[in-house]
Amino acid sequence: MNLERWTQAAREALAQAQVLAQRMKHQAIDLPHLWAVLLKDEGGLAWRLLEKAGADPKALKELQERELSRLPKVEGAEVGQYLTSRLSGALNRAEALMEELKDRYVAVDTLVLALAEATPGLPGLEALKGALKELRGGRTVQTEHAESTYNALEQYGIDLTRLAAEGKLDPVIGRDEEIRRVIQILLRRTKNNPVLIGEPGVGKTAIVEGLAQRIVKGDVPEGLKGKRIVSLQMGSLLAGAKYRGEFEERLKAVIQEVVQSQGEVILFIDELHTVVGAGKAEGAVDAGNMLKPALARGELRLIGATTLDEYREIEKDPALERRFQPVYVDEPTVEETISILRGLKEKYEVHHGVRISDSAIIAAATLSHRYITERRLPDKAIDLIDEAAARLRMALESAPEEIDALERKKLQLEIEREALKKEKDPDSQERLKAIEAEIAKLTEEIAKLRAEWEREREILRKLREAQHRLDEVRREIELAERQYDLNRAAELRYGELPKLEAEVEALSEKLRGARFVRLEVTEEDIAEIVSRWTGIPVSKLLEGEREKLLRLEEELHKRVVGQDEAIRAVADAIRRARAGLKDPNRPIGSFLFLGPTGVGKTELAKTLAATLFDTEEAMIRIDMTEYMEKHAVSRLIGAPPGYVGYEEGGQLTEAVRRRPYSVILFDEIEKAHPDVFNILLQILDDGRLTDSHGRTVDFRNTVIILTSNLGSPLILEGLQKGWPYERIRDEVFKVLQQHFRPEFLNRLDEIVVFRPLTKEQIRQIVEIQLSYLRARLAEKRISLELTEAAKDFLAERGYDPVFGARPLRRVIQRELETPLAQKILAGEVKEGDRVQVDVGPAGLVFAVPARVEA
């Protein structure tokens, strides 16, 4: 027995048989050990060969395992070191069979033949030899890795035409032009290899599936009738190819099978760019170069699919590229997407067991097109439908909120009941009786609701079964029509089909007024999913939100004192956007806030973010003092290729990509380098910006606020001289025109001049600042009260028309917070105290009148 003349897989099988014998403590390696190893993999070569010969590999495997368990166990160093005479004879017979079959190596299938001869109850040698020839496709074993080349197409490919015949592919709607062009190229004499090129998600693979469906229906020219489209899995070809040359051998076997089929098989390689360089090692030939000769001669028909970016990999190899004919696949329009979704609707309805309304389909196409800008139609719209249906299905399969709330309440009462059982006083006994009565009432109510819910679920289960049967009947009708079994087709179409359709309709009708089961995916569900994905509120305005938007000025005034013009301008822009009236290609609003320091420009931006998004974190703050040099401008959109930091992306673009719905504050805009304004022009006009990676970032759902101190001296001077607001605004505008280019100023929605704060407004700000301090003290359970005189004292000290409200913060820190902190540290003010603050001759006076008991 010469193991050098065995294939790698056969040698490994013998080695594993030895390991098995050692593990089971058997003295010698016998036939059952080798059978157990060969039959371990259900899809393996031995399994397939025995099935083809008409044997039952499963029964054989169980028989050999029983035999193994009966073998005696031994101890010592000699365990599993010898072959039994019957196994040795079978292995020598395998070598004789190798010579008979004109092979160069003993392969796994040859081993199976030899073992089968030595095992009673298996098919004869001739039957096994016939199965072996069929499995090998008439080839002999000439290499050490020959097993991986048997039935290569079946092993490494997926037959799309078979899947289409079984109705397992989704219907392909439209795309007739592209399918016609692919057919046209396939019918050429040479270079008949179309490659579908398009953005990810536009439906390149679907076009090939559409062609497979047409071939099955016979809706193709004579030259393509009866052909098979096999999708080659590059991953399967590469997987497990441990030894050099094994990958090339597998691919060569695939190419040979396709060539031998004489045009019956059309190969399809998704992600075609993976062919370039696949299996490349030092001195090895990559897949692309192995395909070239067959492609050029027209012996092999290949359809490829790849994206625009990845097609560049193929363009690097002109000899490979010239063998392909590109077919460009454009993104479908919203209208075409709606047609595609209507065609797919039934598949998703059957899968999820829900109904998808037409309004949901239209919403999925329009909302995904408008708000999910980084992905392509129809893929993103299909994803929306799928997720919304999955969400509804999940809701249907879990307990309704109404029942859930009652059960939680019941559990709470049961816990309370157990605690009260230990108490003996009359009050507790009284309460216990009341609780038990309430628990009994709740139990009855829950049982009633559960019964109703179960009844509705039962109807739903029947509906899903009917939908599945309906789907199967439609598939059977298609199959019968293809096979010209017209009697069967008519029987199903005019007998079974209307009956099932009526059943589905009747069950759906029963659920229409259901209390717990909502069966239909609506546009509201789609809007909800879009909001989850993007953070952009696109769902219909709820009553509470309408109120909030109508009272937006009031909300903003809670934190920003005065500045009515600015607040009104911002609130109007937000209302226009949420009512759906804003220009869809521009940001929600773009404002330039001007005014002296400390009057609330930045505070308004923060307040707007907190009001709209319930958190100040939703504000993207770009401090323009960091962008004063020319080279710093690239940080906004990312460093160019080749520079350090290219991978990180831009500070502005990355922030907006992660939060497409936000307030962007460009603080101190006049300090920025002039080149920054060139970037801003694009954002303000088109609502988009391309970063250094070539990705388009969408700014259409952002509020852009720029703040500046330009013209502050003029504002103060105008107020001292008593100029009207309009004149101050015009004077400031003249200063702006000297500093900013007209095309920049012209793109802003509103230029708002903030007024300096008056004494009365500073007094209001005292209240706001004190509320923040009280909130901090509340954590220490200390309450703070200030007399009106104390508040006036702080406002008086903190008023400065030039510096706005900022001096007030310093006054509060100095006069109120610092003395209070000293008193807390000295133990004069403790947890639970009430501190009263008044004015004395030397400033503020603190008093702790009475301790509040904890």
From Swiss-Prot:
Residues 332-535 are annotated as: Linker. Residues 757-854 are annotated as: C-terminal. GO terms for cellular component: cytoplasm. ATP 2 binds at G595, P596, T597, G598, V599, G600, K601, T602. InterPro entries: AAA+_ATPase, ATPase_AAA_core, Chaperonin_ClpB, Clp_ATPase_C, Clp_N_dom_sf, Clp_R_dom, ClpA/B, ClpA/B_CS1. It is found in: Cytoplasm. Residues 545-756 are annotated as: NBD2. PROSITE patterns: CLP_R (PS51903), CLPAB_1 (PS00870), CLPAB_2 (PS00871). ATP 1 binds at G198, E199, P200, G201, V202, G203, K204, T205. Residues 3-147 form the Clp R domain. Residues 6-71 are annotated as: Repeat 1. GO terms for molecular function: ATP binding; ATP hydrolysis activity. One of its GO terms (biological process) is cellular response to heat. Keywords: ATP-binding, Chaperone, Coiled coil, Cytoplasm, Nucleotide-binding, Repeat, Stress response. It comes from the Bacteria. Its main location: cytoplasm. Residues 151-331 are annotated as: NBD1. SMART domains: AAA, ClpB_D2-small. Residues 83-147 are annotated as: Repeat 2. Residues 382-513 form a coiled coil. The Clp repeat (R) domain probably functions as a substrate-discriminating domain, recruiting aggregated proteins to the ClpB hexamer and/or stabilizing bound proteins. The NBD2 domain is responsible for oligomerization, whereas the NBD1 domain stabilizes the hexamer probably in an ATP-dependent manner. The movement of the coiled-coil domain is essential for ClpB ability to rescue proteins from an aggregated state, probably by pulling apart large aggregated proteins, which are bound between the coiled-coils motifs of adjacent ClpB subunits in the functional hexamer. Part of a stress-induced multi-chaperone system, it is involved in the recovery of the cell from heat-induced damage, in cooperation with DnaK, DnaJ and GrpE. Acts before DnaK, in the processing of protein aggregates. Protein binding stimulates the ATPase activity; ATP hydrolysis unfolds the denatured protein aggregates, which probably helps expose new hydrophobic binding sites on the surface of ClpB-bound aggregates, contributing to the solubilization and refolding of denatured protein aggregates by DnaK. Belongs to the ClpA/ClpB family. Homohexamer. The oligomerization is ATP-dependent. This is Chaperone protein ClpB. The lineage of its organism: Bacteria, Thermotogati, Deinococcota, Deinococci, Thermales. The gene is clpB.
